[in-house]
Regions:
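Extracytoplasmic/lumenal domain signature
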Residues: 2-42, 48, 56, 63-217, ...
Length: 423
């Protein structure tokens, strides 16, 4: 059995439930028999001690995702390499979808040597691999330096729109959410990267789900390396926690999981729209997400009870970016113009992460379309939190605002929400 990860320091803070925001929200928690009620889920301060990008936007704050450093002030962008994917059926074909960010990992030596499908790269010290899900239904593995395939792709059977996620302990364990039902049942598929075997399948057509007819997983989950658990939202309207029971032996070249499942099911009385497309944010024992009806929630992962809820006004697919550098942790979020469309406003907000209090709102007019096909507008991209020289700014990218031929990158003042510049 592989040695346990190094000790991790949990994040502690004071936060109390806001019952006035929860009067119209009902919930239930469905647990497999082996998962105790008191199973404590607290994310450590450091998501991973391995060099890489292991989930969408890098980790629980959904505010990173970069790998490496720019050595000097760049004056131009240069295309270094490209990789051509295969193609699935129309209309998805190939390439990447929303969100489509790759995972990147500098494999630790013991992990690299445990994966024979890497071939000669098992002996390449410092090897960095790019792992990309595609609309062609495959997961592609590329050498970061050359862009050449580093091992054979994994064929999942369905187009992948979201971002794959890797085990932040450095274990060769890959989580792939499928976006479109095409050839096989749709859901979350878990693969070991020793022999590329599927070790677990979480079906999207869950009999406990409020939205059983759509089982996609565009969300990129979070793995708690301390508790060996994985949390992810489904478009079927459920929030899942998987207690993995991971068994990895790099000497025997074996990796197995035996997940037990916790399901968080909820209903907001004012909404008939279910489904989580964004990737959950987390701070210690608090998790944050939004749904297709615009309900933004904070839940206590230790008990799976909601702490607060907020009605954003419309579908919220962009992940909630969490800024922990402020005196109090804040969430930056925004909604689309979808159910309120085709003409309406995208509302960009800063929310106190501990209370759900809206600290500012800045709204921008947008225009979607109903014909010849429905097209939504507003915020789809996850906000980017400024650091360093731009630590006072937060960046939003909005679509079809104010009209169908327009879009903008907005820099807003973190403290006030005022527009500083746009492009």
């Amino acid at each position: 059995m592989f040695a346990p990860p190094p000790p991790a320091h949990p994040i502690w803070f004071d936060a109390e439930a806001q019952p006035e925001s929860l009067t119209t929200l009902t919930r239930s928690v469905l647990r497999d028999a082996g998962v105790p009620e008191g199973d404590r889920q607290v994310f450590p301060e450091t998501y991973s001690t391995v060099d890489g990008v292991f989930t969408f936007r890098g980790g629980p704050t959904r505010s990173g995702g970069a790998f490496g450093r720019v050595p000097r002030k760049p004056v131009a962008l240069q295309l270094v390499w490209t990789h051509q994917t295969a193609q699935s059926r129309a209309p998805w074909f190939g390439g990447t979808g929303w969100t489509g960010q790759p995972a990147i990992v500098r494999w630790p030596d013991v992990m690299r040597h445990s994966m024979p499908k890497l071939g000669e790269r098992t002996r390449q010290a410092g090897f960095v691999e790019v792992i990309q899900g595609s609309l062609d239904g495959r997961v592609h593995f590329l050498d970061l330096q050359t862009g050449k395939p580093s091992r054979p792709p994994i064929v999942t059977g369905n187009p992948i729109k979201g971002s794959v996620s890797l085990d932040p302990r450095g274990y060769p364990l890959l989580f792939v959410g499928q976006g479109i039902p095409e050839n096989v049942p749709i859901g979350l598929r878990v693969y070991e990267l020793i022999g590329h075997t599927e070790v677990f399948f979480l079906p999207g057509a869950d009999k406990e789900a409020p939205r059983r007819e759509w089982g996609a997983f565009d969300s990129s989950g979070l793995l708690n390396r301390v508790t060996d658990t994985y949390v992810v939202g489904g478009e079927n309207g459920l929030l899942y926690l998987l207690k993995l029971h991971t068994a990895f032996d790099p000497i025997a070249l074996s990796l197995a999981v035996a997940p037990e499942v916790v399901r968080y099911r909820y209903k907001e009385a004012s909404s008939q729209h279910f489904g989580v497309e964004n990737s959950m944010s987390a701070l210690g024992w608090l998790a944050f997400f939004a749904d297709n009806g615009g309900t933004v929630q904070a839940i206590d992962l230790r008990t799976f009870t909601p702490l607060w809820a907020f009605a954003a006004g419309d579908d919220t697919d962009a992940s909630l970016a969490l800024d922990t550098s402020l005196p109090r942790p804040a969430l930056f979020t925004g909604c689309e113009v979808d159910k309120t469309g085709p003409k309406g406003f995208t509302h960009l907000r800063r929310i106190d992460a501990l209370t759900g209090t809206v600290e500012w709102t800045n709204s921008f007019e947008c225009r979607g379309a109903l014909t010849p096909k429905k097209i939504d507008a507003g915020l789809f991209a996850t906000p980017a939190i400024g650091t360093g020289d731009v630590a006072d700014l937060v960046f939003f990218t909005i679509a079809r605002c104010p009209g169908p031929e327009n879009g903008a990158v907005l820099a807003l003042d973190k403290a006030t929400g005022a527009e500083v510049w746009r492009m």
